[in-house]
A protein has these predicted regions:
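Short cysteine clusters
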Residues: 51, 71-74
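Generic recognition of long tandem-repeat/solenoid scaffolds
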Residues: 67-71, 85, 105-109
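N-terminal pre-ligand scaffold of iron-sulfur
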Residues: 1-64, 97-120
Length: 120
């Protein structure tokens, strides 16, 4: 299996520019779409703005003591590391890698390649 390739999108000039709420979640713009950034310990994660279960705004949720994103509507929990639902319902939260560079904060969106690469 080949290594994933990402196109990196700048979401902030610096980490200090990102306005994290008390719950350690911030909403940022990624090419005209809202996504969330979450901080847990020393790690930074990017994930979808809405819960895949019922569309709850995850920025209004919280990060639990284990580093899971908790939806404010029905308390569904998702791993920030891999997007998997950890409360057993089988939903999957879109998530993306984050890199902090001298030029700013970047979120990586996987590039499509191989058989379906022509669909870009």
């Amino acid at each position: 299996m080949s290594e994933k390739k990402y196109k990196w999108h700048k979401v902030a000039d610096s980490l200090g520019e990102v306005e994290f709420a008390v719950n350690n979640i911030a909403v940022v713009d990624l090419d005209g779409k809202k996504i969330c950034l979450g901080k847990f310990n020393d790690a930074l994660f990017a994930f979808a703005f809405k819960c895949p279960h019922a569309g709850g705004m995850l920025a209004e949720g919280f990060i639990d003591a284990l580093g899971n994103i908790v939806c404010p509507l029905h308390r569904y929990k998702y791993s920030m590391a891999n997007g998997r639902n950890v409360s057993g319902e089988g939903y999957y939260l879109k998530h993306w890698p984050v890199e902090i560079k001298e030029e700013g904060v970047f979120v990586g969106i996987e590039e499509m390649g191989g058989l379906f690469g022509w669909l870009k």
